Curated annotation (Swiss-Prot):
Assembly: Interacts with GTF2B, GTF2F2, RNA polymerase II and TBP.
Encoding gene per record: GPBP1
GO biological-process terms attached to the record: DNA-templated transcription; positive regulation of DNA-templated transcription; regulation of DNA-templated transcription
Protein's recorded name: Vasculin
GO molecular function: DNA binding; RNA binding
Transmembrane annotation, as ranges: none
Modified residues (Omega-N-methylarginine): R87
Modified residues (Phosphoserine): S49, S274, S276, S322, S381
Biased composition (Basic and acidic residues): 119-133, 305-329
Disordered: annotated span: 1-26, 44-163, 196-240, 258-286, 305-342, 444-473
Amino acid sequence: MAQHDFAPAWLNFPTPPSSTKSSLNFEKHSENFSWTENRYDVNRRRHNSSDGFDSGIGRPNGGNFGRKEKNGWRTHGRNGTENINHRGGYHGGSSRSRSSIFHSGKSQGLHENNIPDNETGRKDDKRERKQFEAEDFPSLNPEYEREPNQNKSLAAGVWEYPPNPKSRTQRMLVIKKGNTKDLQLSGFPVVGNLQSQPVKNGTGPSVYKGLVPKPAAPPTKPTQWKSQTKENKVGTSFPHESTYGVGNFNAFKSTAKNFSPSTTSVKECNRSNSSSPVDKLNQQPRLTKLTRMRTDKKSEFLKALKRDRVEEEHEDESHVGSEKDDDSFNLHNSNSTHQERDINRNFDENEIPQENGNASVISQQIIRSSAFPQTDVLSSSLEAEHRLLKEMGWQEDSENDETCAPLTEDEMREFQVISEQLQKNGLRKNGILKNGLICDFKFGPWKNSTFKPTIENDDTETSSSDTSDDDDV
């Protein structure tokens, strides 16, 4: 018995005592109590107190030997012969019978007059032992539920509200999150007196109570199982529940216990409440599926653009702009956290997805790196090149003529020689050489403005290529 002095309160397993146990207790505590009439008187007083006293009052002078506070969580819920049972814990799970066979010879005479008590209390002991096991540990004794349950403890916990077996699998999905709010929203009963659940704010007790297996209950039992503490809980449950945000739901459960249709509606309420976090879990794969489809469309679109280098893009900028808006929106959906700027640097060079991600991305200036001196090839349409260069920030009027000197005849002659050599080598495609110099001088008004940025591009980048990654290509 001494090992229970250092155990926490929830490990105190109440046990059916015997007069042998009482004598053994006296032997273990012989340093506190002498082997004189004191022991005999205390024994008589303990056994006689079971006649008419309540369990909390029946041992006024140390019938419990200082263990009343250890068993205090159990001393106020029963009456009658229960005070016999407040004598300690299981020894290896086996209970001793209440006969005087186990007594040694020296204590035999002292307990002979207790034998009538032992004979009459034996049936009560078995019944109360089952009651102890099934009320506090019903998962250990599922067949107890067939017996009538009349003495209920006032402590409120998960056993007054056993989990609903129909919505159990959904609840286990929610338990994995380990969130107290989700547990309460999914229908777990976390109501009750603060004395019975002292650590209610932490996730530990509620997760533990959600994971404790529920005994296989017959379907008619829960009303009888819950109806005993209805009167006790109506007064105390509302303030505790309202602080945890489940006031309406558990108030409905506590007031609607005695009616079978209301219990079915409670189950429906359980199911609806527990399905809401599960729906949140199910929305994630749905969203990723949609973005996957969008990115597949986008990749196909980009592959098509790479394949034929469509000239309609340069001639029909509005159509391309609308497609690029859709493109960048899909890019934002799939990479909202990474802000990948270029999936294909040839086509969406300067598009950065917006961080807020509300609706579609507004149309931005679409800049193509193919106008720079790379291996990318422009179309042969001069109008498209002109429009593209204007988009890049090059101006058609004579502002650029002030900053660059006009070309001399020697420079033009040298350029033509270089372009002829390159053309002989077969590097000319669609009117553009790979070094980015334009060899056709039919368009006189803007040849200077075209020539200067392509030359300057080697050391100083132009105004519109600040965010481009052409040097890395």
